[in-house]
From Swiss-Prot:
Region (Disordered): 1-25
Cystines in this chain: none
Main localisation: nucleus
Domain of life: Eukaryota
Keywords recorded for this protein, A-Z: Developmental protein, DNA-binding, Nucleus, Repressor, Transcription, Transcription regulation
Gene Ontology annotations for the cellular component aspect, listed alphabetically: nucleus
Quaternary assembly: Interacts with GL3 and BHLH2. Interacts with SIEL.
Name this polypeptide is given: Transcription factor CPC
Tissue expression: Expressed in trichomes and in young developing leaves, as well as in root hair and stele cells (pericycle and vascular tissues). Expressed in epidermal root hairless cells (atrichoblasts) and moves to root hair cells (trichoblasts) by a cell-to-cell movement through plasmodesmata (at protein level).
Length: 94
């Protein structure tokens, strides 16, 4: 009896994990990020704050009224990320 209860719990756990993995992979692969427009002042502040505190997006967003940590991170990744660097290069070649 104990063994079957344990096996049942493991099965439930595996199902939950596989659902979580599936939703994460779908989310990542299906997202098409739109460019985040930042003013020059915001860009400067983000760069300076990043040098001071690293990727603590909540802290950086707290210094820029009306911006969420997600927007700040998305902006940073799109401007400085390797994946987006290739897209920028291809875009400007056209």
């Amino acid at each position: 009896m104990f063994r079957s209860d344990k096996a049942e719990k493991m099965d439930k756990r595996r199902r939950r994990q596989s659902k979580a993995k599936a939703s994460c992979s779908e989310e990542v692969s299906s997202i098409e990020w739109e460019a985040v427009k930042m003013s020059e002042e915001e860009e400067d502040l983000i760069s300076r704050m990043y040098k001071l505190v690293g990727d603590r997006w909540e802290l950086i967003a707290g210094r820029i009224p009306g911006r969420t940590p997600e927007e700040i991170e998305r902006y940073w990744l799109m401007k400085h990320g390797v994946v987006f660097a290739n897209r920028r290069r291809d875009f400007f070649r056209k």
